[in-house]
Curated annotation (Swiss-Prot):
GO terms for cellular component: cytoplasm. Belongs to the elongation factor P family. It is found in: Cytoplasm. SMART domains: EFP, Elong-fact-P_C. The keyword Cytoplasm applies. This is Elongation factor P. Involved in peptide bond synthesis. Stimulates efficient translation and peptide-bond synthesis on native or reconstituted 70S ribosomes in vitro. Probably functions indirectly by altering the affinity of the ribosome for aminoacyl-tRNA, thus increasing their reactivity as acceptors for peptidyl transferase. The gene is efp. One of its GO terms (molecular function) is translation elongation factor activity. It comes from Bacillus cereus (strain ATCC 14579 / DSM 31 / CCUG 7414 / JCM 2152 / NBRC 15305 / NCIMB 9373 / NCTC 2599 / NRRL B-3711). Its main location: cytoplasm. One of its GO terms (biological process) is peptide biosynthetic process. The lineage of its organism: Bacteria, Bacillati, Bacillota, Bacilli, Bacillales.
Amino acid sequence: MISVNDFRTGLTISVDNALWQVLDFQHVKPGKGAAFVRSKLRNLRTGSVQEKTFRAGEKVEKAHIENRRMQYLYASGEAHVFMDNGTYEQIELGEKQIERELKFLKENMEVAIMTYQGEVLGVELPNTVELQVTETEPGIKGDTASNVTKPATLETGLVVQVPIFINEGEMLIINTGEGKYVSRA
């Protein structure tokens, strides 16, 4: 059992006989009444996203998920193919199962496949990934105001805000948890 006060992004829990992954959470302390935790959860079996509210201090069951190291090979229509590096076994995951992770996946990338009692649930990404900028506006010389950003489209289709000095073709390090620019690669 784990307290909802200990929620963190990516945590897997079992609530109402379903497996959920915490996508987002917020501790709320209203001026009047008891504190609570508002969370956004994704059902690992169906891919549906739900918002649930828990009382502060409420206990939920932590799901023990096993991670298998695999390599992302390619997309085949709606299916995405992964290969176990040790056994060369290939598995296919549907687009709905890995919808959020698709923005960060590149061919031949090493990832962890989450399984629960032999059932494949989804993909766990590394904390950061290197992606190439495919489209962005050119930076304007002399624009030195602090924290000036512009949108940049990356090779996977992900759009992130980057500093004004970033140009097309550059490799960037992106935080997969927040989907934000970290630095140049």
